[in-house]
């Protein structure tokens, strides 16, 4: 049902392009279409935020913007103008939403104040200004905190250290890099000795804290879909995916880890499975964690099983064993 909604939503948004003068569909036509995605329904069910990418073929550039449309139907409107804006995420109270923007200091988390009666933004401000940039923001269920991911130097324990290493790398005349292990690149993006870590920051502002320190990617690299990290319903715990194998490039042993939002030692809750565990989601009552699991180590194309972890007994039960429908990531 969610896939059907997303498809129809995207079709309606691009339909006006095809209503213009008829001509053979060209590559330029395809590239000029607005790319719509990330639809999120407001807590009261009245509004849908989504992102749309504007393409400038002459400038060879793409710029995302946040749009809004009534969930009951109506005309869509661009909600944030004057700066790029992507990945909108509602606050639990529906009075604010977070989004990503590169207007100041690279990709950072911004907060917009929202008037639910008029469907307009009444103000906005930048929440983070971390030198290593931010992405993948996620509100806590109580609205007090926001998670985000930043690619940092694992040997650095604070922002000052990361800022210093970034400055040194920028000023260095030597741009060659030495790699002593895999993985050193995903597609065209070099890791440059950095790791993905999950940070938490108070929604009212403050210094971000690294919840997943160490020489590991947390979360692991993903091709899209469900975030590989989630808040518990009470907002006190984080569950995320990380691979701590020594030869991670040849391993699919992604595990689920839990850690307090206040910080501390993380606990591996899927250590017994040598294959991949991913895409955690807490049950609304907080008693369980649902997730995807494979059973064949080292085989990325192994089918996914829907598993449920009992937080009290620490027991796991297999709910399904099937090939996930495309686009669902196994969790519907």
Regions found by a protein language model. Give the residues of each.
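Hydrophobic beta-strand positions that form the internal "hydrophobic ladder"
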Residues: 45-48, 94-98, 146-147, 235-239, ...
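A flexible loop/linker signature enriched in serine peptidases of the S9 family
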Residues: 52-65, 79-86, 98-110, 129-135, ...
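Short loop/turn segments that connect beta-strands within beta-propeller blades
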Residues: 70-74, 113-118, 202-206, 260-264, ...
């Amino acid at each position: 049902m969610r896939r059907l909604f997303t498809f129809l939503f995207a079709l309606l948004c691009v339909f006006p392009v095809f209503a213009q003068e008829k001509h053979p569909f060209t590559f330029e036509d395809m590239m000029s279409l607005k790319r719509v995605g990330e639809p999120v329904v407001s807590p009261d069910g009245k509004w849908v935020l989504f992102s749309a990418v504007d393409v400038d073929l002459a400038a060879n550039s793409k710029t995302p913007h946040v749009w809004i449309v009534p969930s009951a139907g109506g005309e869509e409107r661009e909600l944030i103008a004057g700066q790029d804006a992507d990945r909108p995420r509602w606050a639990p109270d529906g009075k604010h939403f977070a989004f990503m923007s590169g207007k100041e200091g690279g990709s950072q988390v911004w907060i917009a104040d929202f008037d639910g009666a008029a469907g307009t933004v009444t103000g906005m401000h930048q929440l983070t200004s971390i030198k290593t940039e931010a992405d993948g923001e996620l509100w806590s269920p109580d609205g007090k905190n926001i998670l985000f991911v930043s690619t940092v130097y694992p040997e650095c324990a604070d922002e000052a250290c990361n800022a210093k290493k970034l400055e040194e790398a920028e000023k260095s005349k030597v741009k060659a890099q030495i790699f002593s292990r895999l993985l050193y690149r995903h597609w065209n993006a070099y890791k440059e000795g950095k790791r993905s870590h999950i940070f938490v920051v108070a929604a009212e502002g403050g210094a971000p804290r690294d919840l997943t320190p160490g020489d590991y990617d947390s979360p692991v690299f993903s091709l899209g879909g469900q975030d590989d990290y989630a808040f518990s319903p009470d907002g006190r715990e984080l569950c995320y995916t990380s691979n701590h194998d020594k030869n991670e490039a040849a391993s699919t042993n992604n595990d689920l880890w839990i850690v307090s939002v206040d910080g501390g030692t993380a606990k591996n809750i899927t250590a017994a499975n040598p294959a991949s565990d991913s895409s955690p989601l807490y049950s609304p009552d907080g008693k369980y964690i649902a997730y995807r699991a494979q059973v064949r180590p080292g085989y990325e194309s192994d089918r996914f099983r829907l598993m449920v972890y009992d937080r009290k007994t620490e027991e796991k039960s297999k709910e399904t064993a099937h090939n996930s429908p495309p686009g669902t990531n196994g969790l519907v």
